[in-house]
Every structure is written in C-alpha cells, then in structure tokens.
C-alpha cells in the first residue's frame, strides 16, 4: 500500500529560517483555517497483476487518513479517517482487493479533538487492541473485527507510555507513575 498526498491547492506559507548567518524564508504548504487543505489517496499495488487500486474513502476529500493497518489475512485494510476539524474519527474497514468500503467498526468524537496516534494491534485473527484517550487517559480497548467493543482493558487511570506486545493472553506495556516521575512495567490479562 502507498499514500499519495496532493498539496497543489494549499497556500504557500513562509517560515523564517535563522539557522544560517543571513536568515531566509523557507516556503512550506500550510492549510490555514478556512482555506483548502491537502487531499490524500491510499493505493494498493498488486505485484501479481501489476495493477493499482485506490481505497474508496469517500467524501469529503479534505480529511486525514491515519493509523493504516493491514488485516491478518491481507484481504482488508483498516484506516482511521479523521475529519479536518480533528474531532470525529471513523475507524473503517476496506477491501484490499477492490478498494471498496466495507464498514465502520467504531467512531470516536470529542468537543476538543481526537488524537489517533497508534495503529491497531491484532492479537488474533478477529480481535485487536485500540489505544485511545477517549476516557481522558491513554488506555487500551479490545475490539472484535465486527466492531464490537469487547472490553476496556485497563480499569485504572493509566497514562500508557509504550506498548510492548501481546503473548499468552497477556498485554505488556509501561505507564507513568501517578507522580509522573517514574515508569512501571505492566502485564494485564
């Protein structure tokens, strides 16, 4: 799979570069509020057929495609589709064969913003972990591929630092201590 971004409709924005003796403006593309944003496509190239298909993520074109993951059998691609305001996420499943939309597994909404930073982690062919701050803390949620929330994995108010993996029905991760000065290693079933 590959990601293609078109910024041709985005306004140029100057950033002052003062790293050299004489400063100069570096021009970047920056989508100012109320102006056009970049547009993205996600494509899948099939080496056997030498053909490319594009994932049908739908409208609007000004959206963010993030946390892209392959399914365990390589038949599906999962994408967190985030609106431009970054306050509404749809976690969608698409066909890797023809690019068609299959279903929305779940949605996350916030009055402030949704910040999807971590891709899904499959722990079996039909269950996966999703990491989210939807309860105000960085937490793990166990879902099945039908989109059903099986459970919130952590009952305590953890601020997860790193996810290390899954083995023998256990999730391994580290989180900051309550005072924020230390890090604890955890194993949760």
Predicted regions and their residues:
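Short loop/turn segments that connect beta-strands within beta-propeller blades
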Residues: 46-50, 96-99, 144-148, 189
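Structural motif
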Residues: 9-15, 39-41, 86-93, 136-141, ...
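A broadly conserved detector of short glycine/acidic/proline-rich loop/turn motifs that flank catalytic sites
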Residues: 6, 48, 83, 134, ...
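Repeat-solenoid scaffold signature
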Residues: 1-8, 169-189
């Amino acid at each position: 799979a590959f990601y293609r971004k078109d910024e041709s409709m985005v306004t140029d924005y100057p950033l002052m570069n003062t790293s050299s003796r004489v400063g100069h403006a570096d021009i970047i593309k920056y989508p100012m509020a109320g102006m056009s944003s970049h547009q993205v496509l996600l494509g899948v190239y099939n080496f056997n057929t030498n053909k490319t298909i594009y994932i049908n993520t739908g409208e609007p074109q000004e959206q963010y495609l993030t946390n892209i993951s392959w399914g365990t059998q390589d038949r599906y691609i999962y994408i967190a589709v985030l609106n431009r305001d970054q306050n509404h996420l749809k976690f969608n499943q698409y066909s890797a064969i023809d690019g068609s939309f299959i279903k929305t597994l779940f949605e996350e909404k916030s009055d402030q913003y949704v910040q999807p930073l971590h891709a899904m982690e499959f722990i079996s062919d039909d269950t996966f972990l999703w990491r989210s701050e939807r309860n105000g803390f960085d937490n793990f949620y166990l879902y099945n591929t039908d989109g059903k929330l099986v459970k919130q994995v952590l009952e305590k108010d953890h601020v997860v630092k790193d996810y290390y993996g899954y083995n023998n029905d256990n999730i391994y991760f580290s989180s900051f201590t309550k005072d924020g000065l230390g890090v604890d290693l955890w194993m949760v079933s």
